[in-house]
């Protein structure tokens, strides 16, 4: 006995269409009630509602044609980027900006913490210019180090940067005491 292949249920707009038709029926019923009752206020209210609906529809069309913002999130066109396009876009933005990439205050706290660990004095005093200069040097060093590590990954015919690439880049540079880099060993 052959089994049928699983076919997922397709979503349709029937629910939305049902809601629209229900609201139209309700409006028609309200119009008939107000006419039969002879209520002038109800007629004026319904006329205003109908005019408002027409105005909304016309402004929506105008917005779509003129390129203005859309009325709701459902009306937006979802744009999909190819994989890697957003990363390249961010890299271009970072290359164009002359500002520092690492936040200043966390970097200053780290420098002060390291300087208190290295010296026996209570605290060294740093000028703001010295901290900015140190930060630019550190960022340049990190960029060049990651470029070397990326070259090691490409040499291994990989795109993913791994810890062994960082260790190899540090070893080629002649840095023997590289801490924080875990090199897995095979048993």
Curated annotation (Swiss-Prot):
One Pfam family here: Histone
Predominant place of localization: nucleus
InterPro entries the record matches: Histone-fold, Histone_H2A/H2B/H3, Histone_H3/CENP-A
SS bond list: none
GO terms for cellular component: chromosome, centromeric region; nucleosome; nucleus
Basic residues bias locations: 1-12
UniProt keyword annotations, A-Z: Centromere, Chromosome, DNA-binding, Nucleosome core, Nucleus
Biased composition (Basic and acidic residues): 22-33, 44-55, 64-76
SMART domains recorded: H3 (SM00428)
Biased composition (Polar residues): 34-43
Region annotated Disordered, chain positions: 1-76
Single GO term (MF): protein heterodimerization activity
Cellular compartment(s): Nucleus; Chromosome, Centromere
Record CDD domains: HFD_H3
Function: Histone H3-like nucleosomal protein that is specifically found in centromeric nucleosomes. Replaces conventional H3 in the nucleosome core of centromeric chromatin that serves as an assembly site for the inner kinetochore. Required for recruitment and assembly of kinetochore proteins, mitotic progression and chromosome segregation. May serve as an epigenetic mark that propagates centromere identity through replication and cell division.
PANTHER family found in the cross-reference section: HISTONE H3-LIKE CENTROMERIC PROTEIN A, HISTONE H3.2
Membership in a protein family: Belongs to the histone H3 family.
Subunit structure: Component of centromeric nucleosomes, where DNA is wrapped around a histone octamer core. The octamer contains two molecules each of H2A, H2B, CENPA and H4 assembled in one CENPA-H4 heterotetramer and two H2A-H2B heterodimers. CENPA modulates the DNA-binding characteristics of nucleosomes so that protruding DNA ends have higher flexibility than in nucleosomes containing conventional histone H3.
Protein name as catalogued: Histone H3-like centromeric protein CNA1
Source organism per UniProt: Tetrahymena thermophila (strain SB210)
